[in-house]
Every structure is written in structure tokens, then in C-alpha cells.
From Swiss-Prot:
Subunit structure of this chain's protein: F-type ATPases have 2 components, CF(1) - the catalytic core - and CF(0) - the membrane proton channel. CF(1) has five subunits: alpha(3), beta(3), gamma(1), delta(1), epsilon(1). CF(0) has three main subunits: a, b and c.
UniProt entry keywords in alphabetical sequence: ATP synthesis, Cell membrane, CF(1), Hydrogen ion transport, Ion transport, Membrane, Transport
Subcellular location: Cell membrane
InterPro entries cross-referenced by the UniProt entry: ATP_synth_F1_ATPase_gsu, ATP_synth_F1_gsu, ATP_synth_F1_gsu_CS
Protein name: ATP synthase gamma chain
Membrane topology: Peripheral membrane protein
GO biological process per UniProt: proton motive force-driven plasma membrane ATP synthesis
Pfam families for this protein: ATP-synt
Top-level taxonomy: Bacteria, Bacillati, Bacillota, Clostridia, Eubacteriales
Length: 283
């Protein structure tokens, strides 16, 4: 049985850890609110861009564009979005597990790592990292997403990538983050027919010109939304993990305190027994 001194030292250590995890939970909760607001603001815009893209593509009469061009697939690129840090439960592990299952059977996949965890994971497993974007900060900027999108667009247009996929964690709620894969390039335009009266649009200077401007914006917006979803999921997972760690620390403190009380009681009982034994010996 541990001594009272050892138990006091352990209780002090666990209390110190509990204070840290509690503070991290509060910080994650504050960041989560901001990240969640950003996701909720970005989703309608991304959906509207997709809707407009489908209308313009239909109006253009099947106009050709490099970002719509499907060709023989030789090189597949994966933009894999993770966090830069850990302490967020299984958030990173779930994304990396999904990404690993996607690239496992692909010959020489091009890895575009967004986040330190993504870069380090695939580097350790011998994959060549085509590009990495790490330490992007807590507040994701559109300029960061635009840089990543422009990189894969240039590679796709140059013929170095034949397909590009996004692998990230879609934010469902605080407790649920769902790893998903989304095809980014070539851009797939929805062809489903709308019900009800249709609105006829006039495009200036032409539907083809609007499409040429809209396609890169659509790719940039899709990457931006994925990064925002991943950031919200990271903070939600971290808040949940730190809340669980704080509760576990409390339970451990209670157990250690009980052990300390028992150790004290045993020591007192032993002292009383020694006193009684000594008194009996003097009689």
C-alpha cells in the first residue's frame, strides 16, 4: 500500500492536471462557438455556389472547361485535412484511418497534407508529400483555402493530377464528427431536374464566361468549407475529450483521497495498538 506522503503527492499532481484539462475544455468551448458559427455561415454559401454552378453549366449547353474535363486516371491526389495538435480524442485518428483506407490501393497517390498530424502520419509511412500546409492558426482564412485550391487546380490543369479528393471530418454536432471523402476535381455539375416553375437567367457576357469564373471559385469555396468543418470538429472533439479527462481526474482524486484516509486510519490504529501494547507491557 502506498504511503500517505506518496498519496498526497499523487493527489496534488492529479489536481494540477485537472486544472489544466478544465482550462483547455473552456478554451475549446469558446473556440468551438466561433468555429461553429463560421461553419453555419459557410454552408448556405457553398450550397448556393453549387446551385448556381449547375444552372450555369446547364445554360452553357455543355461548354468545355479544363476543370470539367475527365480523363484517364493515372495520378490521384488527396487533400487530407487534420489538426495540427492532439488532445482531441479520436478526431485525427478517425480521419487518418479513412484517408489510409482510401490511398492504400492507389498507385503512387499524391498527398497534399493540411495539418501537422496529416503530414507526419504519411511521412512516417513512407509516402511522398506533394505539398503540406501546417500551423494555419485557429481562425481559418479564405486566403489559406484559396492557396490550397489554386495549387491543386494548377496541378490538375497541368495534367499532374487526374483526380483530386478531399478527406476531412464533417462537423455534425459537438459529439459527432464524420470522416468523409469528397471529389473535388474534375468538378461534377448536378444534372437533376428541378421541380416547379423554372427561372430563366441571362448571363453576361455569356454562360461560358461566367462558368469559367465560377468553377475556380467553387473549388476554393469547397476547400474553405472543408477546412471550417474540420476546425469545428477538432474543437468539438477537444472539448469533449477534456471534459472526459476532467471527470476522470475527479474520480481518481476521490479514489486517492479514500486511500489516503484509509492509510491515515491504519497509521492511527497502529499507533493506538503500539500505545496499548506498551502500556500493557508496563503493568
Amino acid at each position: 500500500m502506498a504511503s500517505a506522503r506518496d498519496l498526497r503527492r499523487r493527489i496534488k499532481s492529479v489536481k494540477s492536471t485537472q486544472q489544466i484539462t478544465k482550462a483547455m475544455k473552456m478554451v475549446a468551448a469558446a473556440k468551438l462557438r466561433r468555429a461553429q458559427e463560421a461553419v453555419e455561415a459557410a454552408r448556405p454559401f457553398a450550397l448556393k455556389i453549387k446551385d448556381v454552378l449547375s444552372r450555369v453549366a446547364a445554360a452553357s449547353g455543355g461548354a468545355s472547361h479544363p476543370l470539367l474535363e475527365e480523363r484517364e486516371v493515372k495520378t490521384i491526389a488527396y487533400v487530407i485535412i487534420t489538426a495540427d495538435r492532439g488532445l482531441c480524442g479520436g478526431f485525427n485518428a478517425n480521419i487518418l484511418r479513412r484517408a489510409a483506407s482510401e490511398v492504400r490501393d492507389v498507385n503512387n497517390p499524391a498527398i497534399v497534407a493540411v495539418g501537422t498530424k496529416s503530414r507526419d502520419y504519411f511521412t512516417r509511412r513512407g509516402y511522398d508529400i506533394t505539398a503540406s500546409y501546417v500551423r494555419l492558426g485557429e481562425a481559418i482564412q479564405f486566403s489559406q483555402a484559396k492557396e490550397i485550391a489554386r495549387f491543386v487546380i494548377d496541378k490538375y490543369v497541368a495534367g499532374e493530377f487526374d483526380e483530386v479528393h478531399l478527406v476531412f471530418s464533417e462537423f455534425v454536432n459537438i459529439l459527432t464528427q464524420r470522416p468523409v471523402k469528397v471529389k473535388l476535381l474534375p468538378v461534377e455539375t448536378p444534372t437533376e431536374e428541378k421541380k416547379g416553375p423554372q427561372v430563366e437567367y441571362i448571363f453576361e457576357p455569356s454562360a461560358e464566361a461566367v462558368l469559367a469564373e465560377l468553377l475556380p471559385t467553387y473549388v476554393e469555396t469547397t476547400v474553405f468549407r472543408a477546412m471550417l468543418e474540420a476546425k469545428a470538429g477538432e474543437q468539438g472533439a477537444r472539448m469533449t475529450a477534456m471534459d472526459s479527462a476532467t471527470k476522470n481526474a475527479k474520480e481518481l482524486i476521490n479514489k486517492l483521497t479514500l486511500s489516503l484516509n484509509r492509510a491515515r486510519q491504519a497509521a492511527i490504529t497502529k499507533e493506538i495498538s503500539e500505545i496499548v501494547g506498551g502500556a500493557a507491557a508496563l503493568e
